[in-house]
Amino acid sequence: VEETKNFLKILMKYYENFLKDYLDVDLLSEFKSVREWKNFNRNNSHMKEYYGEGQWLNKLRCYLHSKPFVKWVEEETEIDGLVIDSFGTGEGVSLMQTNDMLDSHIDFNWNNRIRMHRAVNLLIYLGSCRGGEFEIWDDKREKTLFEASPIHNSAVIFTHSETQAHGVRKITSGRRYSIRQFYYKSEATCENPHQSLYWYNPETKMPTNS
């Protein structure tokens, strides 16, 4: 199932049955055994965060970083030249339980480590809960433009916006995990681009650009 919403400033797509080959089941089991959760409390937002590794989480990250998957994200968003941050700055796993919520906010737009602009966000949801609707607001944060109740093994892809905030409503019961993956793009240009340059060898007649 795929649902697309284009609000001029944000491209938003929602998918169900996102992960295959029982990877969702393996990840859910792995997350339930994690003990190193850290509390996240900021501006009326509260949940738990995990920035570590795991057998199945590492497998998922390899998949999300792979050439075929990045190409798929480019096709879905119609944004070429996307790259990943191998250090995963700001990425991780969130755990939201009863009374947890994420207040409406604008994401960070610049990754200083790789010197690139944040372009696309991918969220993968595991587990079941009541409440916890994902929502996107208009520029004035007065009207909800999009609202979805992510089910187990669903995903959301949306492009970065400097004006349209998003957030997660309060969880009323249950437990849900979300995995964050970001994709970046450079707006830099090169004044004199070229391929590999070699010293000219008169004996082999090697061209300078081969």
Question: What kind of region is each of these model predictions?
Answer:
Residues 15, 22-26, 68, 77-81, ...:
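A generic secondary-structure signal for well-formed alpha-helical elements
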Residues 94-100, 104-120, 126-210:
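Catalytic core of Fe(II)/2-oxoglutarate
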Residues 2-20, 92-104, 123-126:
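Charged, low-complexity, helix/coiled-coil-prone segments
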Residues 58-60, 78, 106-111:
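Short secondary-structure capping micro-motifs at structural edges
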